Amino acid sequence: AGVLSLTGCSSKDTAASTASSAPLNKLDSIQKSGKLVVALEGAWQPWSYHDASDTLVGYDVEVSRAIAEKLGVEPEYVESDWDSLFAGLDAGRYDMVCNGVEVTEERAKTYAFTTPYGYIHTALAVRKDNEDIHSFEDLKGKTTANSLASTYMELAESYGATVQGIDTLEETIQLLTAGRIDATLNADVSFYDYLNVHPDADFKIVAQTEEASHVAIPLRKGDASATLLEAINNAIDELRADGTLKELSEKYFGQDISSEN
């Protein structure tokens, strides 16, 4: 399948009123409005970010656009920081979050997750001259920087690190290379992409989780979302079967993250 073009609209910290109510059938409401309101950060390359022409691009952007096409609607993108994404979903300000969200037992208690569309490992990065940190166990008593309420923050804290809240990977790398934090955690593919763009960046990856995390789309739980969940799952299955997910993965990550290896 060919890579889909990017022509949808984008708004900053705002959402369409069509996503603000809680209809009896969310899928019917979306298809009647002709819009699928999608929330993402827009500042996490290569998941969602602005290119040199300030166009919103990325794996999550194109995956959600392909899903919207399967549903017969247009995507409307809402950009927000990580900490606000779930609050906005809870409030019904948008229909779904497509932002490299890892499925966890705790999140699954609150949200209905779709079929995974990505599989990633969490990696640990330090400055190139750091000889103290070689594993996650070495984080005890160290300082890291990550988005608050992220799985990366939770993992760092579980190993005894103090976590400084930060919004973007770019800011995190700046803190790390300046020596203001000891380490940081993120998706392995995000670090590799950063190093591909900035080959002279002063950091190295020293460890990563053995088990892959499942990346999926969270929806609000409830009967109103049941048909929407089924429709998105069907769309993801079709996009995997026809090779679209693989193609988009290789475009943005240089490898296929759409299937569990």
Report each predicted region and the residues it spans:
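Periplasmic-binding protein-like
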Residues: 119-126, 188, 192-234, 255-261
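C-terminal motif of bacterial Sec signal peptides marking the signal peptidase cleavage site
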Residues: 4-8
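Flexible hinge/capping segments at coil-to-helix
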Residues: 20, 127-143
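Short helix-initiation/N-cap motifs at beta->coil->alpha
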Residues: 25, 77-87, 131, 148-150, ...
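Extended ligand-binding regions for polar small-molecule ligands
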Residues: 10-12, 16, 61-70, 150, ...
